[in-house]
């Protein structure tokens, strides 16, 4: 994957527009989770150190395009950046017709989705973005799967279009895990439905040696193998699909599970052998023996890709399976990459972030890359690098 990298460019005195993913949760005007801002800070600092005039843009939430909405304003992000960097970071609302930014200055543009044509990737808007800068830097992996004005269009028209350090690191890590993984490779794919992760399962079945499934996905595989799943969430119409995937790659199945009679925080958890699951049982986690078996598989792996908790870990009594696997990944010498919203929440809960080789910041983009799809914002950077 050949793209120009911001780290290789001379930015002294250049006007640099950086597209970051600063789409963070905000409550009462205050940022409540700063992970994405923290991930973007090194890129912003590096551009400033290189002597650039720095303009940062992002979206936040889903406002009606072309209309200002206070709840989707990036003001809380500007306030956060001002504190984090110890300098005033101005939030600029009117910038499309040009803005004066000096070398060493930093401004944050207001939500790009307030601009008409952003989501449709309108050339007219993209050309206005491009006219603002000498160098456009795409650093928002989380939005790389969307062809929008500030992620794709601007890269077509900017004098120079490059990948930022965060995006470059993400692409390198994903390439390492998927293009030529050290073997044996294990993948953990969990979630409520096979249908939503079918392309991921199919794609991984051709590169990994062990495909560990969890959640509702595992229930469909259990049913495909003829095991009882009680009243658990599963997809009867995808049983044949599960059989076809299991014929291509080793899919180790649970030997024991944690069940309950209801889906609730107060539900009583009972460990049962898989054959003993009753008609009114709901499977909400893998059992301790299964967790130990899966941990053993992870121990002998050289590459691990993790997407999704294997149980309802938000309720502690159904979190042991995810906790054991999280610790096994942390203790493993394998190159490990994790991604997807719930996965990140599990990593936080069990305190293993420092031990995972790479944590992906992109939810949808992470999955689309794993599926083998082309990410438009990356494809345009590759095109520009060739030219």
UniProtKB/Swiss-Prot annotation:
It comes from the Bacteria. ATP binds at residues 197, 314, 340-343. InterPro entries: Phosphoglycerate_kinase (IPR001576), Phosphoglycerate_kinase_CS (IPR015911), Phosphoglycerate_kinase_N (IPR015824), Phosphoglycerate_kinase_sf (IPR036043). GO terms for biological process: gluconeogenesis; glycolytic process. Substrate binds at residues 21-23, 36, 59-62, 113, 146. It is found in: Cytoplasm. Gene3D superfamilies: Phosphoglycerate kinase, N-terminal domain. Monomer. This is Phosphoglycerate kinase. It comes from Pseudomonas putida (strain W619).
